[in-house]
A protein has these predicted regions:
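Gram-negative/organellar outer-membrane beta-barrel architecture
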Residues: 1-80, 137-140, 151-154, 166, ...
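Repeated loop/turn-to-beta-strand initiation elements of outer-membrane beta-barrel proteins
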Residues: 1-2, 29-35, 69-73, 111-116, ...
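Short strand-loop junctions, especially beta-strand C-caps/beta-turns
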Residues: 6-8, 85-87, 181, 215-217
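A generic structural signal for short coil/turn motifs at secondary-structure boundaries
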Residues: 11, 90-93, 184-187, 220-223
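Short, glycine/acidic-rich beta->alpha junctions
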Residues: 15, 96, 193
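A broadly conserved detector of short glycine/acidic/proline-rich loop/turn motifs that flank catalytic sites
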Residues: 27, 67, 120, 142, ...
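C-terminal outer-membrane beta-barrel translocator/porin domains of Gram-negative envelope proteins
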Residues: 56-168, 176-180, 184-185
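C-terminal beta-signal and terminal closure region of outer-membrane beta-barrel proteins
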Residues: 188-239
């Protein structure tokens, strides 16, 4: 059994609260099936176009595969997560929606101290109408570096994060950054390809892993602007 509680606030425009629980069954030590139920409530103190208070009930069926082995500082990782869901959004009317979320990670060891690391994240929401405050948020360390955390929203999004990693010591690696993303927002009728590049480093401490990534995000028809460079900082620890 699992449970979740998530609160997301977009300035003073809206606030979304999501509660849920799920059950899972291990088919093998590396694979499992999941069944999740979530309830989402959105409030909008500031009325705006395409922003409306709603509640949403959603049922998801998920499949996960995960294989991980540790070789020095590198995790040789293969992960696939697929979740499909049906939801009902209630405002003045009731709308039935379909969604799919995919996350895939692949690490390829070239030698004892070099590795290529790839990560894909895909989201698709199909609906007869959309609200800005129900769209998924993207951008940042886990989806598209070089852009602010959760600064992008869309009903269709797919990103590929790529790194070439070099390990000069057992507790440190240096990595390049090249991220590419396709984004489509049916509310604004915008469809763009975004990308970013940069470099980073990760090192082990006594408490966990500290990651620093410096990346510059580029939009269509825009040249390089150093002011668009963002430093992403994360600290991972296991309790």
């Amino acid at each position: 059994l699992s449970a979740q509680l998530n609160i997301f606030r977009q300035d003073s425009i809206f606030s979304n609260t999501t509660q849920g629980f799920g059950i899972s069954y291990n088919i093998t030590p590396q694979t499992l099936l999941k069944l999740d139920y979530t309830f989402e409530n959105s409030t909008t103190p500031t009325p705006l176009a395409f922003t409306e208070e709603f509640t949403k009930n959603r049922i998801d069926l998920g499949f996960q595969y995960n294989r991980r082995t540790t070789q020095s500082f590198f995790n040789n990782t293969e992960t696939i997560k697929i979740h499909t869901g049906i939801s009902q959004r209630q405002t003045k009317n009731t709308v039935t929606q379909f969604s799919i979320d995919i996350e895939a990670v692949k690490s390829i060891n070239i030698s004892n101290n070099t590795q290529i690391h790839l990560k894909n994240k895909t989201h698709y929401l199909q609906s007869s109408s959309y609200l800005t405050n129900e769209l998924e948020r993207f951008g940042g360390m886990n989806t598209l570096r070089g852009f602010k955390e959760n600064s992008l929203n869309a009903n269709t999004f797919s990103s590929i994060q790529s790194e070439f990693r070099y390990t000069p010591s057992s507790k440190l690696y240096i990595n390049s950054i090249f991220d590419l993303a396709y984004i489509k927002n049916d509310i604004t009728n915008q469809e763009n390809t975004l990308y970013s590049f940069g470099f980073g480093t990760s090192f082990l401490t006594q408490s966990g892993t500290l990651k620093l990534n410096l990346a510059n995000g580029l939009k269509p028809k825009e040249g390089f602007d150093f002011s668009n460079t963002i430093l992403h900082l994360t600290f991972l620890t296991v309790f």
